[in-house]
A protein has these predicted regions:
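Secretory targeting signatures
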Residues: 1-21
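A short beta-strand-turn-helix
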Residues: 28-52
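Extracytoplasmic/secreted envelope proteins and their assembly/folding machinery
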Residues: 44, 68-75, 103, 142, ...
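Loop/turn elements at helix/coil->beta-strand transitions in domains of secreted/extracellular proteins
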Residues: 48-53, 81-86, 113-118, 149-151, ...
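Short pre-active-site segment immediately N-terminal to redox-active cysteine/selenocysteine motifs
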Residues: 49-52, 57-60, 94
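Structural microenvironment flanking redox-active thiols in thiol-disulfide oxidoreductases
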Residues: 65-116, 120-130
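Thiol-/selenol-based redox modules, centered on thioredoxin-like
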Residues: 138-144, 148-187
Length: 187
């Protein structure tokens, strides 16, 4: 009996398709600045242009401010690449930090840590979506990304799949190189 089961497993093992991760995206309210390109950010629309680097931020997070400043130094060069490496900052603690707090810290050229890319403001109720049809799924955006702390970064390929992540609190001398290497692997 065991022999028959073993033979069946061996013979049928090639018949099973490996599971591939399905892409996920989000559509979320922004600060509605010029840099946000509208009041709602669609990751699916942005992925049609190129990969997206997601940075979870908080107003009181020192590491988030350091990451923002480091990423800002490379943002224009990354946007000039083909395809561009886009960035979106995701406010993590909207229950405790107001939209105005986020705008003051990150939203304006005169802000301490100006962010020249979209900033989105998800709530705990905003759902992650399937990339094909943008249907809302049962997980929230935060749940899908593993209830991230701040700062936390994820590189999303053009299929909506997470291909790299970093939970390093402060960027170091290798951080930008890591991001650029991950980008090269997904294009």
């Amino acid at each position: 009996m065991r022999f028959v089961a073993l033979v069946l497993v061996v013979l049928l093992s090639g018949c099973i398709n490996p599971t591939t991760e399905e892409g996920r995206v989000f559509t979320i309210e922004t600060l509605d600045r010029v840099e946000d390109a509208g009041s709602v950010y669609s990751m699916k629309d942005n992925l049609s242009e190129g990969p997206v680097l997601v940075l979870f931020i908080g107003v009181g997070c020192i590491g988030c401010k350091d990451w923002t400043d480091d990423l800002r130094e490379h943002h224009n060069d990354w946007m000039d690449q083909e395809p561009p490496l886009q960035i979106v900052s995701v406010e993590r603690y909207l229950r405790f930090e107001t939209k105005e707090d986020v705008a003051e810290e990150f939203g304006f050229p005169e802000s301490n840590h100006y962010t020249p890319w979209p900033i989105v403001l998800p709530t705990d109720d905003d759902s992650i979506q399937r990339i094909e049809d943008q249907a809302n799924l049962s997980q929230s955006v935060f749940e899908y990304y593993g209830l991230p702390g701040t700062p936390e970064l994820f590189l999303i390929d053009q299929e909506g799949v997470i291909r790299w992540e970093s939970s390093t609190y402060y960027p170091d001398q290798n951080s930008i190189e890591e991001i650029e290497n991950a980008y090269k692997k997904v294009i």
